[in-house]
């Protein structure tokens, strides 16, 4: 199967599904997501009758999401440096092995809570490795104009699974037992692995000269740290997910303790969330208020029909926020750091859920279920009201395409790729009347340098030269600087540099300084 479509289909919400490779993998991911939600329902339902149930049930979500918090950035670095297809296939095999063990021990009635949480954590490790690699693959499968639709379809896959998986799991738990639910989840990993084996990319996933793992890890962290747009996206995700995690963490207890429902009824509640999520819009503030209102309904209304009805708009709100911030990240991140940037987003998302679930479970144990849900609902409403204060930034006019425009450096000596650190100086001449504007314009250039590899950056006046300015920045190695030359820069970086250089006069002089103690 070819990974590159011959032509871009008409732009529509469903256009990516007309591409055979995307459709095949999307259906496989849907099957895997259905299995994952069945697994969650089964694991939580095994614990609802245990002592300390509020904490144990909430810990299922923590065990699932904590690996993403711990491993997201390393997983993103792996996805940016290794063959993504092979990485995904290997991870699915690992997940299937864990699933077989989980199924066998549950069927043998040898599944104490500690072991269940340990194996749930192991499944979370696999998901942590899968998420950034899969998210980074999506832009390779569809034309750029279909990326928003493809991202939305990815979210729809999750929420279709959230609608179907819990309902099926509820029936299976009641009729066949939890072990059968775990077996179905294990089979879903095999389905995804099979689809990946059938996919044959036109070109290798990894770069021609892969980055070293530690260098890639540091480069990803620098990019996120020095990108205001990415930091704002992460802030909005965190402000929603932390209070929002209360619903997912405490819903099993609402079902069993307040509504008197069995596993089938709990599945229906989760299905109502999923149905609403499939039909979401793009209104962040309204979404937050709606979700907060649903948490208050769960706290105050012990009527199953009303709670089920309230969960549908909550699903809409959840999907609204997730699809909005996820698409914003995918559209903004350049290809060279996409998996690492998305992994940080997943880290914030998973960390918010894992730590939030732990906090809401502890509060539920100390103050009661109603108090925990009411506090979470109020916190969500406050977070929603911050949208006008810290909105997502409009990046529709920002050119994110790669731009190779720096001239190749010509050195009088041979520099080893790992030689470093390397100091780069750029000398400018700026007329007095333009100097204030030049200094301001160079702030954007400095952010660009840091995003693409510079550890330090500064702009200085040349004391011995009238109207002279010297830009100085340090990169970890010669290899890292060559990567700046060879594909890390985007059209937006080029535009920022051109705005600054338009304020200068005469030639610009560039020098590369290498360590004196290295040959």
Segments (PLM) and residue ranges:
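Alpha-helical transmembrane-bundle signature of multi-pass membrane transport and export proteins
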Residues: 1-394
């Amino acid at each position: 199967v070819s990974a590159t479509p011959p032509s871009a289909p008409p732009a529509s919400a469903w256009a990516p599904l007309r591409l055979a490779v995307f459709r095949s993998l999307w259906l496989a991911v849907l099957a895997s997501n259905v299995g994952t939600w069945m697994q969650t329902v089964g694991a939580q339902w095994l614990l609802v009758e245990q002592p300390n149930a509020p904490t144990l049930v909430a810990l299922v979500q923590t065990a699932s999401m904590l690996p993403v918090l711990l491993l997201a950035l390393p997983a993103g670095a792996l996805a940016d440096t290794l063959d993504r297809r092979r990485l995904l296939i290997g991870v699915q095999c690992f997940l299937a092995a864990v699933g077989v063990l989980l199924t066998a021990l549950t069927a043998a009635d040898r599944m104490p809570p500690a072991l269940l949480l340990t194996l749930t954590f192991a499944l979370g490790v696999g998901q942590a490795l899968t998420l950034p690699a899969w998210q980074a693959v999506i832009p390779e499968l569809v034309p750029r104009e279909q990326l928003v639709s493809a991202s939305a379809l990815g979210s729809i896959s999750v929420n279709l699974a959230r609608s179907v998986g819990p309902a099926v799991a509820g029936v299976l738990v009641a009729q066949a037992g939890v072990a059968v639910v775990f077996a179905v989840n294990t089979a879903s990993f095999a389905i995804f692995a099979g689809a990946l084996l059938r996919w044959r990319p036109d070109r290798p996933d990894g770069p021609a000269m892969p980055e070293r793992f530690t260098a890639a890890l540091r480069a990803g962290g620098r990019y996120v740290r020095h990108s205001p747009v990415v930091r704002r996206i992460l802030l909005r995700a965190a402000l929603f997910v932390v209070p929002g995690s209360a619903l997912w963490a405490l819903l099993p207890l609402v079902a069993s303790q307040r509504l008197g429902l069995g596993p089938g009824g709990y599945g229906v509640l989760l299905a109502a969330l999923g149905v609403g999520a499939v039909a979401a819009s793009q209104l962040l503030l309204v979404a937050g208020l709606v979700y907060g209102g649903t948490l208050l309904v769960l706290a105050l209304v012990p009527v199953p029909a009303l709670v089920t009805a309230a969960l549908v708009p909550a699903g809409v709100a959840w999907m609204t926020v997730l699809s909005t911030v996820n698409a914003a990240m995918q559209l903004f991140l350049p290809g060279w750091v996409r998996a690492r940037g998305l992994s940080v987003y997943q880290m914030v998302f998973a960390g918010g859920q894992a730590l939030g679930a732990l906090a809401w479970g502890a509060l539920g144990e100390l103050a009661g279920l109603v108090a925990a849900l009411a506090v979470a609902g109020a916190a969500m409403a406050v977070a929603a009201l911050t949208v006008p204060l810290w909105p997502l930034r409009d990046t529709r006019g920002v050119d994110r395409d790669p731009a190779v425009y720096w001239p190749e450096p010509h050195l009088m000596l041979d520099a080893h790729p790992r030689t470093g650190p390397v100091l780069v100086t750029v000398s400018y001449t700026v007329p007095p009347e333009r100097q204030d504007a030049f200094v301001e314009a160079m702030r954007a250039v400095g952010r660009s340098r840091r995003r693409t590899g510079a550890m330090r950056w500064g702009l200085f006046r040349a004391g011995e030269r009238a109207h002279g300015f010297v830009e100085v920045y340090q990169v970890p190695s010669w290899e890292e600087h060559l990567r700046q030359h060879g594909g890390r820069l985007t059209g937006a970086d080029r535009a920022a540099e051109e705005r600054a250089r338009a304020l200068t006069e005469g030639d610009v002089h560039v020098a590369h300084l290498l360590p004196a103690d290295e040959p």
